[in-house]
Amino acid sequence: MKLTALNSTVRRALLNGRNQNGNRLGSAALMPYAAAETRLLCAGGANGWFFYWKRTMVSPAEAKVPEKEKEKEKAKAEKSVVESSYWGISRPKVVREDGTEWPWNCFMPWESYRSNVSIDLTKHHVPKNVLDKVAYRTVKLLRIPTDLFFKRRYGCRAMMLETVAAVPGMVGGMLLHLRSLRKFQQSGGWIKALLEEAENERMHLMTMVELVKPKWYERLLVLAVQGVFFNAFFVLYILSPKVAHRIVGYLEEEAIHSYTEYLKDLESGAIENVPAPAIAIDYWRLPKDARLKDVITVIRADEAHHRDVNHFASDIHFQGKELREAPAPIGYH
């Protein structure tokens, strides 16, 4: 009896387009749908009411799911647009000479170059005074543990060498930069020259990492060596730039020797002459079919240039002058 009375009340409310508060609902177009809904409820009895309750509880949530997803995607799209355009910073499309897209973010096409492989590799600065001898003996002493640890694993040796070789240019460039700011003086281009050297050595390392996958203990060794060498060279450069540059010059001479031995093993077949990494081909403008031997050849030439620059810088200091008084070899990789 009560169910019949309730059905009649609901039917009249739906047909008249009113809600539970007595307010009239939106449109009369809903009335046929409401009438059909009411007939189903009455015909189904208790089951009909359960079906109606379940539908009202489930349908709105299901309808909201795609809307939430759309709102989320829209917010994400708006956020990405804001992040890339709000500050007005956007990278222009960079292409190679053949029109293909440039794949690297770490350097641009105008920073690539062809290394001068005809440079004299046999040059050696003969120690002339006590400080020169100290620098020379220090480098020879540092070579002993390197030979014992790496032996003829020249790929791993080169990786370790480049983590050290990239430090002096950064330290020297940084200290000259601070000196220029402190004394209101030009650097003579030496800040740029030394930072270019550091960047060039870093690219050597990025290339070697593509060829040699360092083990966990080698990574740990790199961490320790870099921490010790950076701080030691920082203090040395403050105390005596002439000795610091002379040590780097002798380090580069050792690097030339190591890469020469590397090439001997490549030529003898002891080390496989694998294809050159893509980053090396683009950085040194090598042929597309370049091999590892070509990469080691250009890296060795770079080390010879760094040898000349640092011995030259040390000679300037030994003559009692400052670096800014002599023209810096900018772009001299």
Swiss-Prot record:
Its EC number is 1.10.3.11. Keywords: Disulfide bond, Electron transport, Iron, Membrane, Metal-binding, Mitochondrion, Mitochondrion inner membrane, Oxidoreductase, Respiratory chain, Transit peptide, Transmembrane, Transmembrane helix, Transport. It is found in: Mitochondrion inner membrane. It is an enzyme of class 1 (oxidoreductase). Gene3D superfamilies: Alternative oxidase. The chain crosses the membrane at residues 158-178, 220-240. Fe cation 2 binds at residues 201, 252, 303, 306. One of its GO terms (cellular component) is mitochondrion. This is Ubiquinol oxidase 2, mitochondrial.
